[in-house]
Amino acid sequence: MLRVESVSKDYKEFKLRDISFDVKKEEHFIILGPSGAGKTVLLEIIAGIIEPDEGRIILNGVDVTSYPPEKRNLAYIPQDYALFPHMTVYDNIAFGLKLRRISRQEIDRKVKEISKVLGIEHLLHRKPRTLSGGEKQRVAIARALVIEPELLLLDEPFANLDVQTKSRFMTEMKVWRKELGFTSLHVTHSFEEAISLGDRVGVMLRGRLVQVGDVKEVFSNPVDEGVARFLGFENIIEGVAKGNILEANGVKITLPISVEGKVRIGVRPEDIILSTEPVKTSARNEFRAEVIGIEELGPLVRVNLKIGGITLKAFITRSSLIELGISEGREVYVSFKTSAIKVF
C-alpha cells in the first residue's frame, strides 16, 4: 500500500535518517515518538508538502516522490485541523469533491453520507468558529475521508481534545475504520493511542525509526535501552551477571536468561508489586525496601524505593497506598517476576 524507502531529510532543527517502513491496506499504523523526533516532518514528506533529500515514497507500487500533494490521493489532517473559517461545515467537507468536478448531486450525497457516519449532520450549516474541539475534529476527518483517499495521514489527532472527548473519539475511530475500511498513518507521542488504535507501531527517536512491529511485541520487548526508557521502563539497573543472577550494588536479581558480564536490565514500575508482608507468588525476586519518596500522579502514585545500593520506582493506586499504609520511611516488601525483566 504505502512503502517508505530510506528517506532522509535535514529540515530546520529536524534530521530524518534512513527511514524505511510500509503500511498495509486497511491498517492503522502508528508512528510513536517524543516531541521533536521528526514525526510531523515525515508525514509532510509522505504528503508531498516537503521533499526528501534522499529516499522514495511508493504508493500502490507507484513512485510518487516527485508528485505534488494533489496528485497523491492522500488526505492529511494537521494538528490544528486547518478548517476554512469562512466556509460552513458543509462547504468544508465538500471542498475536495468540488476540486474533482463532481456533480452537485453527487457532492450532496457524499457529504450527507459521511456526515451521518461521523454524527455531524446537525452541524452542516455552522461555521468552524462555533464548533467545539471534538466537533472540529469530526469535520476534519469527514473532509478527509469524503474524497476516499488511498491513505489518511493523522498528525497528533487527539492532542487538542479533553480526556473524555479523546476517549470517546478513540472508540469511535475503531467503528469508523470498520465501516469505511480506510488505511491510516497516525503520528503521536501517546502510548494510549498507540495501544488502543495501532495494528503496528514504529518507534521514532531522534529522527530515526528504531523499532517497528506488533504493538504488544514492541511494548514488551523494546529493541534497546533507548526505546525501553521511552516506552516506560523507568527502572534501569546496571550490574554484573553470572548465569541467571545479576549482582548490582550488593543486590542479587534473578534474570529470565543466562548471560555473562556487565549488563543492564529494565523493569516497568507497574510490574513491581508492593506489600507489607512477604508474598507467595510466582515472582522470583523479592526484597525488603525502604520507601524514600511518594509522588502523586492523578489516579496513580509513584513510590520511590531503596533496596541496598539500588533504587526502584513502583506504581500503585492511591487506594492501595492508603490500604497498605505506605508512607515515606516505612519498610515494605518489593517483588517482581523474572518475566517482567528486559535484559539489554
UniProtKB/Swiss-Prot annotation:
- Keyword presence, Disulfide bond: no
| Gene name tied to this protein | wtpC
Q: Where would you say this protein principally sits, based on its record?
A: membrane
Record's GO cellular component terms: plasma membrane
Q: Which GO terms describe its biological process?
A: molybdate ion transport
- Keyword NAD assigned to the entry: answer is no
- UniProt function note: Part of the ABC transporter complex WtpABC involved in molybdate/tungstate import. Responsible for energy coupling to the transport system.
Q: Which superkingdom? A: Archaea
Q: How does it assemble?
A: The complex is composed of two ATP-binding proteins (WtpC), two transmembrane proteins (WtpB) and a solute-binding protein (WtpA).
Concerning SUPFAM superfamilies, the annotation shows: MOP-like, P-loop containing nucleoside triphosphate hydrolases
Q: Where in the cell is it found?
A: Cell membrane
Protein name per its UniProtKB record: Molybdate/tungstate import ATP-binding protein WtpC
Organism per entry: Pyrococcus abyssi (strain GE5 / Orsay)
A GO molecular function assigned to this protein is: ATP hydrolysis activity
Q: Which reaction does it catalyse?
A: tungstate(in) + ATP + H2O = tungstate(out) + ADP + phosphate + H(+)
Keywords noted in UniProt: ATP-binding, Cell membrane, Membrane, Molybdenum, Nucleotide-binding, Translocase, Transport
For the ABC transporter domain, which residue ranges apply? 2-231
Entry similarity comment: Belongs to the ABC transporter superfamily. Sulfate/tungstate importer (TC 3.A.1.6) family.
Q: Where is the Mop domain?
A: 280-344
Gene3D superfamilies associated with the record: 2.40.50.100, P-loop containing nucleotide triphosphate hydrolases
